[in-house]
């Protein structure tokens, strides 16, 4: 393992792997069962290493094309959506069946861009991912092709996977495609194209080198992967573009081997993200916690539970940034709250298992999840 790959890959704890239509299907549109089985084996093995795994899978439309007996990718939006509606069920059933052979539970998450742009829905999506990962579930993500017009007309799962990587604070995003990585020109048309093993910054030259190559069944070319790289690396995730024809691509990446093109995540992303939560957004209210909760938050990286809350100050809604004060009214943290001020006032000091009895419902055990919390003294 060389020093650069060791630095950026050796300690990854959470990865997002995106596979495209060209990797999952044959040119006929039918599913490539051999590649799917190999993919599942590697993802399962990665989880066995202790790495949390999220799969962003294209292929719903491609699978639907095969099932419906279509000769080529549909051109109209209703035809594409019909193929996606049929294909999504086929794809998930296939994944569930093969993952079960390795004893791995899976959960389907269908997202739209709106889910990741609306504050409350963004928070809900984030909490769903964290809950699944904590229970050892492998989330399988796709954009909801059956209903989202914009995705089918303009979008791609490369961008979606980068947004998911940012959403869950992934250490590494892996885009699996049908070429070895990034070249200085399109290798499909230029036999003298030179391979680029590492990209430390996405410059105009890198964008120009991406070109626009894409397959007949998919929507994402290299240009969309570079755009995904901008999103991922700016939020701190490193990214690798790799050829899915290599049967051990994921194992090789995690072992630090020279495979694919590595895009280096920006090292100051954590600080930047924490500064956003700590300083860029003014808290709309405060939560005062007891000494036990303060210790759990500051020293043990725990979530804030209602039992440790003494009182609240101000009026705020679910999904807003609030200030957390200790019993001496000293500010110790900022966080994104799962409950509004009225709800917290009702459940403060109570065990989480009593939330439903008090409110009539329980959306979360935590008032603020540890992943949505920044300890100010750590900045």
Swiss-Prot record:
Subcellular location as annotated: Cytoplasm
Task: Note whether Transmembrane occurs among the keywords.
Answer: no
List GO BP terms, alphabetically: L-proline biosynthetic process
Q: Which organism is it from?
A: Clostridium novyi (strain NT)
User: What's the name of its gene?
Assistant: proB
- Pathway of this protein? Amino-acid biosynthesis; L-proline biosynthesis; L-glutamate 5-semialdehyde from L-glutamate: step 1/2
Provide the residue positions that the database annotates as binding substrate.
58, 145, 157
Protein name per the record: Glutamate 5-kinase
Q: Where is the signal peptide?
A: none
Query: Which PANTHER family does the record match to this protein?
Result: GLUTAMATE 5-KINASE, ISOPENTENYL PHOSPHATE KINASE
Annotated family:
Belongs to the glutamate 5-kinase family.
Q: Where is the PUA domain?
A: 284-362
Reactions this protein catalyses: L-glutamate + ATP = L-glutamyl 5-phosphate + ADP
**What is the enzyme's main class?**
transferase
What GO terms fall under cellular component here? cytosol
Give the main localization category: cytoplasm
* Function in brief: Catalyzes the transfer of a phosphate group to glutamate to form L-glutamate 5-phosphate.
Q: Which UniProt keywords apply?
A: Amino-acid biosynthesis, ATP-binding, Cytoplasm, Kinase, Nucleotide-binding, Proline biosynthesis, Transferase
E.C. number(s) listed in UniProt: 2.7.2.11
Keyword ATP-binding attributed:
yes
């Amino acid at each position: 393992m060389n020093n650069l790959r060791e630095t950026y890959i050796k300690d990854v704890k959470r990865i997002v792997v995106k596979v495209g239509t060209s990797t999952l299907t044959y040119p006929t549109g039918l599913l490539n069962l051999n590649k799917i089985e190999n993919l599942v084996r590697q993802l399962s093995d990665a989880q066995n290493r202790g790495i949390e795994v999220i799969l962003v899978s294209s292929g719903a439309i491609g699978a639907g094309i095969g099932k419906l007996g279509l000769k080529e990718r549909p051109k109209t939006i209703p035809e594409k959506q019909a193929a996606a509606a049929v294909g999504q069920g086929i794809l998930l059933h296939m994944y569930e069946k093969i993952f079960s052979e390795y004893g791995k539970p899976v959960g389907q998450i269908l997202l739209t861009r709106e889910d990741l742009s609306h504050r409350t829905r963004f928070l809900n999506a984030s909490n769903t991912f964290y809950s699944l990962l904590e229970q050892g579930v492998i989330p399988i993500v796709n954009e909801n092709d059956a209903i989202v017009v914009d995705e089918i007309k303009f979008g791609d799962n490369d961008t979606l996977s980068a947004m998911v990587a940012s959403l869950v604070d992934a250490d590494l995003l892996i885009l699996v495609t049908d070429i070895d990585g990034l070249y200085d020109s399109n290798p499909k048309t230029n036999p003298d194209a030179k391979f680029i093993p590492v990209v430390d910054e996405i410059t105009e030259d890198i964008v120009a080198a991406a070109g626009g190559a894409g397959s007949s069944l998919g929507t994402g070319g290299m240009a969309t992967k570079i755009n995904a790289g901008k999103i991922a690396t700016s939020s701190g995730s490193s990214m690798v573009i790799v050829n899915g024809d290599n049967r051990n691509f994921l194992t090789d990446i995690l072992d630090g081997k020279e495979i694919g093109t590595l895009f280096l995540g920006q090292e100051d992303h954590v600080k930047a993200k924490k500064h956003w939560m700590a300083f860029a957004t003014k808290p709309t209210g405060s939560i005062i916690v007891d000494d036990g909760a303060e210790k759990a938050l500051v020293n043990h990286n725990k979530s804030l539970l209602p039992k440790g809350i003494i009182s609240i100050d101000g009026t705020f809604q679910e999904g807003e940034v609030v200030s957390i004060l200790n019993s001496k009214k000293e500010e110790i943290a900022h966080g994104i709250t799962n409950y509004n001020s009225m709800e917290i006032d009702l459940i403060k000091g109570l065990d989480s298992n009593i939330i439903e009895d008090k409110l009539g419902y329980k959306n979360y055990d935590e008032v603020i999840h540890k992943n949505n919390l920044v300890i100010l003294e750590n900045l």
